[in-house]
């Protein structure tokens, strides 16, 4: 049965605390793409703010109860020893880390931006050479992934299903499951592309047209990035394309994916501050600057999140 509201308990670490001008203080967690606030009595709000500020200052994780539908932090606790043990995770080694770049969407030229080795000179691309041979194959991969969406009811070709119908959070898990499909079922290269709203009051804002048309807001987003060879007359070029069935009905150019996250009808602060292309093993960010990343090599975090979100929906 689809659910519109579900509180969840999680161990998280703070990426940043920011207070927009004349706005409500926002709390950003590495383990959640969604932006959260504290809405309570003045006394409770002050107590929570102190706990959160101390956790950020001391770089200590917290156990929180979150209400994703309202984007609110309902309770804050100290993690148990067992929770801390499970929370510890690996990070991408510096020698295989990818490229992070600031971006001005208004000045982006799609005719050149998406061309690999022209505008997109990314050293980690050299680590894998088996790129997708044509758009038809990329669409086949996209369609296979999209068919695993939990809202379709099954039967599914994979376990667990992927909750594309719930885009409020969980992009890191959806992206990692698709990366597993692309690299093991189809055996093609798959990197990850992260978008960030980590400058000033920037916010990633998307109109969820596939799931009811409501607006959703993130501080980061991630999806599989694939390199697709395209024939143009006598020439062949390789384009960077993104597989993101939560947002689109087909593979799209990297520039299209980025632009869709700056929907001004959803927020006047809608803007992509920067993007980062990382190895497919990157799971979620571990720095607010978007330069270090955690991993999930055995897909345990991935599958747990997919199962937790499988019955949730985006728009009420």
Predicted regions located by residue number:
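Secondary-structure boundary elements
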Residues: 91-170, 174
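Structural detector for short beta-strands of small beta-barrel domains
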Residues: 2-30, 88
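Short nucleic-acid-contacting surface segments enriched for D/E, G, S/T with interspersed K/R
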Residues: 45-65
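Extracytoplasmic
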Residues: 7, 23-24, 71, 219-221, ...
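OB-fold/S1-family single-stranded nucleic acid-binding modules
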Residues: 65-100
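Cysteine-centered nucleophilic/redox motifs
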Residues: 141, 157-201, 224
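A short macromolecule-binding patch
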Residues: 32-43
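His-Asp-centered catalytic microenvironments across diverse enzyme cores
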Residues: 204-316
